[in-house]
From Swiss-Prot:
The active site is at 212 (proton acceptor). Its main location: other. It comes from Dendrobium crumenatum. Residues 549-562 have a biased composition (Basic and acidic residues). This is Isocitrate lyase. It catalyses: D-threo-isocitrate = glyoxylate + succinate. It comes from the Eukaryota.
Length: 574
């Protein structure tokens, strides 16, 4: 007769599983996740893990990032940063800024996985930005090791005089739209964790038509679809056991299209045609007929423009308001109905189109013509009226699933910032906000004085925007320095280099002046000497290295050899 007892291996396996589930539940009860909502259980997470547990350096950086941002939030200040292009920039930034940003735009234009540059359409391989994160994170780790070796080789007096640089500044990376469905987002987030990202942001545009936040033609996905992306990202972080900071971005302020009308929270912002003459003349059908007749290019565009100009596009709410105003009623009764409509459909209530029609019927405006389907684009997208209100609705929906909310804007508008912050804080008072100090804005045309520009960051920080960043700061800084130096080098030769680069490095204490030392030649000399018993005749920084010229001493110059040597000073802060 077969034994009914359970083999010890099975009970041990079950015990390990239950213990891990309990550990995850305890982890989720910590203050770090007090505001986080998950539609899945700890059992789901543990079921997706393997038996070999990993630890990730990025998790330490994520915890550091969380502490940094919460500290700024409490103080009413902001972590300010910009997009870093390379190890030089990331090490220079570390001396002055407490976070690092990795921009998808910069990667798209300067460093894709295929080396094929282009605009920010998120059409590069999905490992492009994770690769850049690893590039910068490895540089951070290396310069941290290099500094550590240098400091432990100093006397206490020397260390006291040598500023310590925290090279391990947390990196927040651009996750674009998640690069596809839920499984694509999961795999992307796994890469980010493995490559060193402390935080990741994901936006609510369609992954098929993704654009830079400051381009036209942006298409949103439904609120529910973007929530699925955020949940997929959080699930992957949970499976890996990390506290990666998740930033949810919305492009709802400037978006003009949306993929579908499936989510009722989007209904109030979708546009429909109100011209009853167009009842059986959808835009898509009109354009298809024109194309079948051989119309192309500018002619086809003119047909579309004419249709749109005569269709009477507006939201359902505006159509109802117009309908009430056309009613043959005393003015006081019209106003009463308008007030009732406004109160019943206040934007934060997210009234669906079906609910709105019921209210309109009650107010005598149920017979209005309004059709959101006939106005759809040839691609099938619905027309969308972007606004701060739309961004608030989306931000509120995303907040339980994200750590920060970022509203992409088209200009640096303090009123707009205040409106968004107030809308978010009304329902999520502890949520952290992010702001793109975009170089796509013409800041000089924004109507601000120099003083107002200087105070812009601290002013919106007090509103709750505790992480602020210039997405393409590294790109523009690199372009400016290279262009101006190249121009002057072409005219003045080495004088341009000495005046614009070498002397400025010296005057500002930039450690790349001694680039051999910056690159770690001393550090690897330590390796060589350690391997060879303390001495090495092939040490890179040994006798004969030209970097000795940069020590604080006078030396004989080489200018005017026909007139004899000229003494020049070559001082540096080594």
């Amino acid at each position: 007769m077969a034994s009914s007892s359970v083999p010890p291996m099975i009970t041990e396996e079950e015990a390990r599983f239950e213990a891990e589930v309990s550990a995850v539940e305890s982890w989720w009860r910590t203050d770090r996740f007090r505001l986080t909502r998950r539609p899945y259980s700890a059992r789901d997470v543990v079921s997706l893990r393997g038996t070999l547990h990993h630890s990730y350096a990025s998790d330490q950086m994520a915890k550091k990032l969380w502490r940094t941002l919460k500290s700024h939030q409490s103080a009413g200040t902001a972590s300010r940063t910009f997009g870093a292009l390379d190890p030089v920039q990331v090490t220079m930034m570390a001396k002055h800024l407490d976070t690092i940003y990795v921009s998808g735009w910069q990667c798209s234009s300067t460093h894709t996985a295929t080396n094929e540059p282009g605009p920010d359409l998120a059409d590069y391989p999905y490992n492009t930005v994770p690769n850049k994160v690893e590039h910068l994170f490895f540089a951070q780790l290396y310069h941290d090791r290099k500094q550590h070796e240098a400091r432990v080789s100093m006397t206490r007096e020397q260390r006291a005089k040598t500023p310590y640089v925290d090279y391990l500044r947390p990196i927040i990376a651009d996750g674009d739209t998640g690069f596809g469905g839920a499984t694509a987002t999961v795999k992307l987030c796994k890469l980010f964790v493995e490559r060193g990202a402390a935080g990741v942001h994901i936006e609510d545009q369609s992954s098929v038509t993704k654009k830079c936040g400051h381009m036209a033609g942006k298409v949103l996905v439904a609120v529910s679809e973007h929530i699925n992306r955020l949940v997929a990202a959080r699930l992957q972080f949970d499976v890996m056991g990390v506290e990666t900071v998740l930033v949810a971005r919305t492009d709802a302020v400037a978006a003009t299209l949306i993929q579908s009308n499936v989510d009722l929270r989007d209904h109030q912002f979708i546009l429909g045609a109100t011209n009853p003459d167009f009842k059986r003349r959808s835009l898509a059908a009109v354009l298809s007929a024109a194309m079948a007749a051989g119309k192309t290019g500018a002619v086809l565009q003119a047909i579309e423009d004419d249709w749109l100009s005569r269709a009477g596009l507006m939201t359902f709410s505006d159509a109802v308001i117009n309908g009430i105003n056309r009613q043959n009623l005393p003015e006081y009764e019209k106003q009463r109905r308008l007030n009732e409509w406004a109160a019943a459909t206040e934007y934060s209530k997210c009234v669906s189109n079906e609910q709105g029609r019921e209210i309109a019927e009650r107010l005598g405006a149920g017979e209005i013509f309004w059709d959101w389907d006939i106005a759809r684009t040839r691609e099938g997208f619905y027309r969308f009226r972007g606004s701060v209100e739309a961004a608030v609705v989306r931000g509120r929906a995303f907040a339980p699933h994200a750590d920060l909310i970022w509203m992409e804007t088209s200009s640096p508008d303090l009123v707009e910032c205040g409106k968004f912050a107030q809308g978010m804080k009304a329902s999520h008072p502890e949520i952290m906000l992010a702001y793109n100090l975009s170089p796509s804005f013409n800041w000089d045309a924004a109507g601000m004085t120099d003083e107002e520009m200087r105070d812009f960051i601290p002013r919106i920080a007090k509103m709750g925007f505790c992480w602020q960043f210039i997405t393409l700061g590294g790109f523009h800084a690199d372009a400016l320095v290279t262009d101006t130096f190249a121009r002057e080098f072409a005219k003045q030769g080495m004088l341009a280099y000495v005046e614009r680069i070498q002397r400025e490095e010296r005057n500002n204490g930039v450690d790349t002046l001694a680039h051999q030392k910056w690159s770690g030649a001393n550090y690897y000399d330590r390796y060589l000497k350690t391997v060879q018993g303390g001495i090495s005749s092939t040490a890179a920084m040994g006798k004969g290295v030209t970097e000795e010229q940069f020590k604080e001493e006078s030396r004989t110059g080489t200018r005017g050899l026909d007139r004899g040597g000229i003494t020049v000073n070559a001082k540096s802060r080594l």
